[in-house]
Amino acid sequence: YIEDYKNLYGIDVDFYTNYEGGKNNNFDITLYRIIQESLSNIKRHSGATEVQIKLYENTDYIILTIADNGIGLTKEQVELAKKQGRLGIYGIQERIFDFSGEFKLLKNNKYSTILMCKFKTEMLKEEKIDENIIN
């Protein structure tokens, strides 16, 4: 997906990972969807020319960061998007919370927006069942 995105939109995307996946299929799909929605939001709203995605795990945590050099995001813009029914960032947040993850929006001198998700590795021990599939 990332290679297709780079080729289609001409946005430089660097992807770094040590995450092997395969321990929890639903979690792996959730990570994919978070990255997919984030890249879609970056294309639609940020004007970024550069994106950096890092997905790494250690003994205790799996951490995903998605950073871009676009126009940035303020709390007011997030609240306005929610009121207008543009819920991309809230969909991402819900996916993170489904796996008891932490969610932060940050920025630094290089990147105007940094989405950070942090999950405890212990939550991967049990396969999350999507109740919507059953019903």
Q: Where do the model's predicted regions map?
A:
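Short beta-strand/loop element within the Bergerat-fold HATPase_c
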Residues: E50-D60
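A short beta-strand-to-loop micro-motif at the C-terminal edge of the catalytic HATPase_c
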Residues: Y56, L106-S112, K120
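ATP phosphate-binding glycine-rich loop and adjacent ATP-lid/helix-beta elements
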Residues: V78-N109
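Acidic ATP/Mg2+-coordinating residue in the GHKL
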Residues: D68
